Amino acid sequence: MENKFYKNLNSESILQIYKLGIFPMAKSRCDEKIYFVNPKKRALLPIKDFHVSKSFSRFIKKKPFYITVNKNFKKVINRCATENRKDTWINKTIENHFNNLHEIGVAHSIECWKNDKIVGGIYGIAIGGCFFAESMFSSVSNASKFALINL
């Protein structure tokens, strides 16, 4: 999609494009430019119909991690951009915009902790009754899934 939003990109314009089903991406972490994706279809996971396997349910019952919400948004988005990845669509511009969205209460993170260290997490934007999960990371097996389950 043409970058018609790019010149005036701010928290409000990002929210407006999300409401249209469009989302920003970068070609790489070091690319300063942002382009906008307008897919014909978007995946939707209704939370009430979300199925958790029996084996993962058993894993959850062991309480392998503890969860916090919005405790360290900046760390979560940064680790989503850098953790175990050669490259990412999350450049510094996008990271900064999402940090601003977090400061105004629209972007949120769920953090998974083990032994006082963040070992997994997910972040996204909440608009109305929808949560647009943008990315997640895990440095310990199943931590990002555990964060997703705790949305």
Please name every model-derived segment.
Residues 1-151:
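N-acyltransferase acceptor-side catalytic subdomain
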